[in-house]
Every structure is written in C-alpha cells, then in structure tokens.
Amino acid sequence: MIRRLAAFSALSGLATAWLPEVNKKITSTNGTNLFTSSNGKIRGVNLGSQFVFEPWIAEKAWSDMGCGGQKSEFDCVSRLGQANANSAFASHWGSWITQDDIAEMVSYGLNTIRVPVGYWMREDLVYSDSEHFPQGGLQYLENLCEWASDAGLYIIIDLHGAPGAQTPQNPFTGQYAPIAGFYQDYQFEGALKFLEWMTTNIHQNDKFRNVGMLEVVNEPVQDAGKVGSMRSSYYPNAFKRIRAAEQSLNIDRNNYLHIQMMDRLWGSGDPNESLTDTYYAAYDDHRYLKWASVAVSKDSYISTSCSDQLNSNTPTIVGEWSLSVPDNVQWNSDWSPDSNKDFYKKWFAAQVTAYERQQGWIFWTWKAQLGDYRWSYQGGLLLTRPGIGDQQVLTL
C-alpha cells in the first residue's frame, strides 16, 4: 500500500513528509533512529503553551510576560500593545522550549513532538484593526523544528488556533471568543491560506525536514450537527489546497504531508464523509478520562484503559491525553500524585499500551508550572526514566 523509502538524508534539497518507519526511516544527525525501540509507534509530547499560550498551564510565566489576569493571547496583546507584546512573546518563545528540552525528550525515549500553532503565525491573515496576536513566531518555529530534526524527532504541526475560534471560550484557540466563529466560508478561507503557506514552508525550508504531518484544526465543536460545513467544505478543500501547493513544488506523492483531522470518536462527525481522496490522511483522537463518563475509581481507570480499543478511522494517533483525574478528587489522599505514584505508573502503562494498538500517542503536555506530573511529562518522569522503552516501566 505504502512503499518504504530510502533512509532520510538531512542534506536533501527539499524537505519531505511521511509517517516514520511506515513510509521512511529517519535518523538524527549522529545516525540514531529513535523509532527502532518503539517498533515504529509514535511516542511523543505536545509543546503546549509554546506558540499558543494557555494561561492555566503556566500562570507564573504568563504573569511574568505582563499578561496576568488576561484570558488569552488576544487579550494580552490588546492589553500590552503590539510592540510590547511582540517583545514579551519573543522572550517566551526563546525560553519555554529550548534545545536542552529537545535533548531531554530524546533521553526519555520519546520520538515525536506535536507543535500547536495559531493561524496568526502567517501575519498577513490577521485583521490588524480588530485582531490582536503576537508577531514574529515563525523564526522560533523554524529554530525549534531544526533542533528536533537534528535530534531525529518526528514533528506534527497542529493548527490549534483557527480563524474566528473553532470552539468558544477556550484560550487554546488563542482568544476567548464568546462563540465559535470558525464555521463560515471566509474563516475557512483564512485557515486554508494558512495551510497552503505552512505546506510551502515545510517543503522548501530544510529546518522543517522532519515535519511529516499537518493537522488542519484542533478540537472542533463536539456536535456533528453544528459543524457540517467543516466536513463538507473545509476538510475537502484543505486536502485540495495542501495537495495543490505540493504539486506546484513538484513534490513526489510519496513525500506528501500526512493531513490530519480529528477522528470520528471525537464527536464532530466522520471526517471522511465528503472526502474523495484519503491518500496520506491521518486522524487524531484525544482521550482524557478526567472528563469521560467513567466511574471514578482506580480499578475503573485501569480496566477502561486496558480495554480501550479506539476503533475508528485509521491511522489514528492519540494526540492528547494525560493522567489527570476529576477536579473534585484530584488532590484527595486517594488520588494525590505524591502518594499514589504506583497507581499512576500502572495507569500510564495501561494507556500507552492501548494507544500503541493504534499509531501511537502524544502526551499533553511536555512542561507546565503546576507542580503536577499528571499534566507534565517533564515534571515527574518517575513514569519513564530512563526511557519509555524500559520494559519494567511498561509492565502492569
């Protein structure tokens, strides 16, 4: 179905795109293949709050930027003014995720990063009289992708913040919008222009050489009846526009980007409903038992995760998940992270085992300022040190 390509060369003229090990082997600059120990499965982390800041993740960093009390990037830029905001966000972009972070991820056996970005990274799409977002992020995205590519990490770029906001009152869209304004033709057009632009950057800039997947929108409204236009118009046009951009660059079909959508289980309908071509389509599911209709007990969480089949569109990557439990119990003695490490190790193992029945997993998130490893892969690492490939860790 998909032929295996020759080993990746970091010195190739145009960057390429693929699923690692399925379509192509990739290595770091020193020749290490991070996917060997995972049998090709994706084992990754999200870089939450790097380019789309979610204040709940890092309240101190948010306050230090001068954004304290603001709900979203839009609100902070409005408050600080463009020039001051650009300076504050540049400082954040240069310090939140560093090259040392990338090296640490590799040392823990991870092989993939998912990078949430907003459409405003293409700055000519922003209505400057009514939209307020930081400027200058592309340079920092380039640097990050170069570090990750040199380290041999696979990279997924995710349109986390869509024009008009794809869901209301949520800072992960970059704004705290009262309604989901994304589901209109002119907003779709803005997102499509972003996808074309990002596709061209990925293929023409060698710093993006390990970007193999582009997610066209993160977490749309979970009501299939309200987002029919996304399935009938936006998804098919995203495929057409991305492929047209690749064809204009004479990219070989085997080097196309995988185009990722939320899967049917997410609740926004079947993403394939109006697609006429699913070549190099990929799918994303987010699995937070914290908010699921599951009995709140340790046995229930373990058994649910052990039996989780996630039968849906394929190939599916579980692109977000965590170890957090419901707010009303999360700091009780029965659930506190400090006194229940053995349970959380077992639950971690149960989840990754289930998700590797699919294409793999990406934990939310790499780092946070919560003092809680249930949301921060870096923050405890009692779970994975010295590496996720350690069979002792993965045994229930």
Swiss-Prot record:
Keywords linked to the UniProt accession: Carbohydrate metabolism, Cell wall biogenesis/degradation, Glycoprotein, Glycosidase, Hydrolase, Polysaccharide degradation, Secreted, Signal
Domain of life: Eukaryota
Entries under Gene3D superfamilies matching the protein: Glycosidases (3.20.20.80)
List of catalytic residues: 219, 320
UniProt-listed InterPro entries: Glyco_hydro_5, Glycoside_hydrolase_SF, Glycosyl_hydrolase_5
Glycosylation sites: 30, 272
Main location: secreted
Role: Beta-glucanases participate in the metabolism of beta-glucan, the main structural component of the cell wall. Acts on lutean, pustulan and 1,6-oligo-beta-D-glucosides.
Record family assignment: Belongs to the glycosyl hydrolase 5 (cellulase A) family.
Official protein name in the record: Probable glucan endo-1,6-beta-glucosidase B
Protein's organism: Aspergillus fumigatus (strain ATCC MYA-4609 / CBS 101355 / FGSC A1100 / Af293) (Neosartorya fumigata)
Protein encoded by which gene: exgB
